[in-house]
Amino acid sequence: MSFKMNRQGELSLSFSFILAIVIIAAVIGVGFYMISYFLGLRNCAELGLYKRDLQIKIDDAWNSEETRESYTGAVPRSVEKVCIGNLSSVANSADYAEIYDKVARFDESGVNLFYYPNPGGNCKIVSGSLQHVRFNGFDCIDVVRGKATVRISKGAFDSTVLVTP
């Protein structure tokens, strides 16, 4: 018995095969997009956690009589510097003048924590506001291997906490 396949059968088989390849490619593409999206959310979460944990350390120092300690927190590797200070003050170093000019556009009331460069992506966190603090001008902290360290100090008669690089 001889089986003969007509032209329509050959065409529908190849169309199904091509459709399956297109669907597989679409699923893989969506998968890569979702992975990159969630990695972007991870970076955003790290920025939020850095600010929150730093504020907790500042609050602990503010509530204590006297303190001198450091805080080291994780930030995304895309961030090169964490800058602190009021934009109404002058940058403490000529090295930070360019950064100061770039973050000056985020001059909102009370904003005194800045991430440079802007993390971009899905993350809209580019600055934050720390409470109960004072600064010696505008300074930046270098991010080393995804970690940024600041010094926190408060004297017995101080009403605010001094945060320095």
Residue ranges and their predicted role:
Residues 2-3, 15-165:
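Long, compositionally biased, intrinsically disordered regions
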